[in-house]
């Protein structure tokens, strides 16, 4: 198989997968009864689900990652941690993806803002989305 044929085959596969994903997303959107929910996830999965369901990002846990123990700790005292400001100490190193991204702390919880480039951008999005969190459903 030539390179051109191989690329053509790959493109066709991607298009078919995209069409299948779109059909699945449409079915899931039709089943969705609560359009006001907040999806809390320790990694990017919550943002992907929100996007696929056509929901706005109603959680600060979008485009970031927390270690499982930090995520559980945060959820156990959501109101307390949400009342704190995120800080970006110099002594914390990124540990995922080998890239450079801001690492913040909210109290004793470490947050890896893996899809942001600056602490300012990460703080802005964190605070903006924290305000959108639907606490009515998180109780």
Describe each region flagged by the PLM.
Residues 25-32, 43, 48-138:
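Positively charged, amphipathic N-terminal segments that serve as targeting/anchoring signals
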Residues 1-35:
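Membrane-proximal basic amphipathic "stem/tether" segments
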């Amino acid at each position: 198989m030539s390179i051109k044929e191989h690329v053509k085959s790959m493109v066709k596969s991607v298009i078919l997968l995209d069409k299948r994903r779109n059909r699945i997303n449409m079915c899931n959107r039709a089943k969705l009864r609560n359009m006001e929910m907040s999806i809390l996830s320790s990694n990017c999965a919550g943002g992907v689900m929100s996007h696929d369901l056509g929901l706005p990002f109603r959680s600060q846990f979008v485009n970031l990652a927390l270690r499982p123990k930090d995520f559980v700790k945060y959820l156990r005292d959501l109101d307390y941690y949400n009342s704190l400001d995120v800080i970006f100490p110099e002594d914390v190193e990124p540990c995922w993806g080998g890239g450079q991204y801001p690492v913040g702390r909210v109290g004793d919880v470490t947050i890896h803002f893996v899809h942001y480039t600056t602490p300012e951008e990460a703080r802005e999005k964190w605070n903006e989305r924290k305000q959108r969190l639907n606490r009515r459903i998180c109780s």
